């Protein structure tokens, strides 16, 4: 499992996100 804090963060690319979160299609990290 990826380590991804449950914080809503807007993003344009994966590097905008914390830890191992990825930028999802709806424009938020997850």
UniProtKB/Swiss-Prot annotation:
Main subcellular location: secreted
Cystine bridges: 4-21, 11-23, 17-29
UniProt subcellular location: Secreted
InterPro entries in UniProt: Prot_inh_squash (IPR000737), Proteinase_amylase_inhib_sf (IPR011052)
One GO term describing the cellular component: extracellular region
Stored SUPFAM superfamilies: Plant inhibitors of proteinases and amylases
Keyword terms of this UniProt record: Disulfide bond, Knottin, Protease inhibitor, Secreted, Serine protease inhibitor
Job description of the protein: Strongly inhibits trypsin, weakly inhibits chymotrypsin.
Entry text on domains: The presence of a 'disulfide through disulfide knot' structurally defines this protein as a knottin.
Protein name per its UniProtKB record: Trypsin inhibitor 7
Organism of provenance: Cyclanthera pedata
């Amino acid at each position: 499992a990826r380590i991804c804090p449950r914080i809503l963060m807007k993003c344009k690319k994966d590097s905008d996100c914390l830890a191992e979160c990825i930028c999802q299609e709806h424009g938020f990290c997850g």
